[in-house]
Regions:
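Walker A/P-loop nucleotide-binding motif
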Residues: 200-219
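Conserved P-loop NTPase "ATPase switch" module shared by AAA+ and STAND
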Residues: 236-247, 253-279
């Protein structure tokens, strides 16, 4: 599903004063639900320490008064979610939910809102379901997969600076598998054609061309809304260049993803036609 990332606000040290919200989703009606979120309006509070029921009460109601930020979420029939680095049992999880509901029980409309608690195990499980996020997390904690990278600026200039995607209306791309006479595309039309193919799943696309014409930049633009609307989900993207000598190999990583029924979009740069055939 499409991610509503343009409607997400976050920033700052999670230990800093934040009014009870570290990350906020404020999506138009239906956009959050369509993107896989429980509600269109969500407030996330992130805690590095364990959160007992008494801690939850104090967090949501400092000095015995419900935080205005949480009250606003309830009035919008949204969701309030606490994410903790601690690991909890099933009994502790339900105790945490009860504590959250009790803390907000005096607010009108609380029964139409949603409260949830994410512990470290639940966060890890979600991360493992999204290969692009796995690559990003491992990179951030200093344990990257050799040669594999999450979505980022894969294509850089000779000076090491990011390149903007440059589009024009001239035909730049051709599809040799299309027997129709009209098989030439502008860059944006080509992006949309490749996106459509990749969304089907269980398929592959080989981008061929002379060195330096922008093949990697084109592949990066597949995941960029700024390059063309209706981009692919960047959290699914996992990138490598064969010159990085990736471990695991592209074939091994693909086998693992298939065995675990995990959805991902692998981009293998500078791969041979034989490797493409194998994949």
């Amino acid at each position: 599903k499409r991610r509503a990332s343009q409607h997400v606000l976050w920033g700052g040290d999670q230990r800093a004063a934040d009014g009870g919200i570290d990350v906020r989703l404020d999506a138009p009606k239906g956009a959050g639900i369509d993107a896989g979120f429980p509600r269109d309006i969500i407030g996330y509070q992130v805690k590095a320490m364990p959160m007992r029921p008494s801690d939850i009460q104090n967090e949501m109601c400092p000095n015995g008064v419900l935080r205005p930020s949480i009250r606003t979420i309830i009035q919008s029939k949204g969701a309030y979610i606490i994410a903790s680095a601690d690991s909890t049992s099933d009994k502790m999880y339900h105790g945490s939910i009860s504590a959250m509901c009790n803390a907000a029980s005096s607010e009108i409309g609380v029964s139409e809102s949603k409260f949830d608690f994410y512990d470290s195990r639940r966060i890890a499980d979600w991360t493992n379901e999204n290969p692009g996020v796995v690559a990003w997390v491992r990179e951030k904690i200093g344990r990257p997969l050799q040669g594999w990278r999450p979505f980022e600026n894969w294509a850089v200039s000779n000076a090491g600076e990011p390149n903007s995607f440059i589009n024009d209306t001239a035909p730049r791309i051709t599809d040799p598998t299309n027997s129709n006479a009209d098989n030439y595309y502008s860059l944006v039309d080509g992006l949309q054609e490749v996106r459509t193919i990749l969304r089907r799943g269980g398929t592959s696309v080989r981008i061929a061309g002379l060195s330096g014409v922008g093949k990697t930049r084109f592949a990066q633009a597949l995941f960029e809304e700024a390059s063309a609307e209706h981009s692919l989900d960047a959290t699914l993207a996992v990138y490598t260049d064969i010159s990085f000598e990736p471990i695991p190999s592209p074939q091994a990583l693909l086998d693992e993803l298939l065995a675990n029924n995990r959805r991902a979009i692998l981009h293998v740069d500078n791969g041979s036609s034989e490797l493409h055939r194998l994949l």
